[in-house]
């Protein structure tokens, strides 16, 4: 039975980058790892309504730099920057380290797989039909320039006694092509019948390697000489 590997993890070091960037010796590694997990969990729970897609963490000496990618940065920053300042103080109290927070706005949230998955999950919690929620999200993504999108919902859909998986796709999703820029998101919907898992894959096109300028110049010169 074939299993789907996380498309982001498969492409790390090829066309995707790490979400955590730091080096540590054996003594500090586990401490930093647990601290990263706690930071991500705290920010996600506190600012879930801001549409947070990704949290990047960098470390240097006693400083922690956090880059938050959000669809609604205004909810995080708050009036006059009060919200982000309060968040920084809470994180400093939790980690006992100097915290620097940077907010990056997601320009097109309809093309961000994590945000799309969370939107579908929130609609399922409001008892909206899973087919309607999935198809609307797919139509919006395709209209805004996605090359392909696939959505899957698993669990006791519509309160059914036997759990099942329903999935729809539109366009192409080349999961085996490593140069394909595929975004992946996962969210859970808490319903009265239990949890439903929501997965979203969005294909945005191929990431082609940059052509070296010197090679292009040599070709131009050879054409002129000919």
From Swiss-Prot:
CC terms in the record's Gene Ontology section: cytosolic small ribosomal subunit
Keywords, alphabetical: Ribonucleoprotein, Ribosomal protein, RNA-binding, rRNA-binding
Example GO biological process: translation
Example GO molecular function: structural constituent of ribosome
Domain KH type-2 stretches: 39-107
CDD domains in the record: KH-II_30S_S3
Stored InterPro entries: KH_dom (IPR004087), KH_dom-like_a/b (IPR015946), KH_dom_type_2 (IPR004044), KH_sf_prok-type (IPR009019), Ribosomal_S3_C_sf (IPR036419), Ribosomal_uS3_bac-typ (IPR005704), Ribosomal_uS3_C (IPR001351), Ribosomal_uS3_CS (IPR018280)
Pfam families for the chain: KH_2, Ribosomal_S3_C
Quaternary data: Part of the 30S ribosomal subunit. Forms a tight complex with proteins S10 and S14.
Function: Binds the lower part of the 30S subunit head. Binds mRNA in the 70S ribosome, positioning it for translation.
Family indicated by similarity: Belongs to the universal ribosomal protein uS3 family.
Protein name: Small ribosomal subunit protein uS3
Source species: Acetivibrio thermocellus (strain ATCC 27405 / DSM 1237 / JCM 9322 / NBRC 103400 / NCIMB 10682 / NRRL B-4536 / VPI 7372)
Organismal lineage: Bacteria, Bacillati, Bacillota, Clostridia, Eubacteriales
Gene name of the encoded protein: rpsC
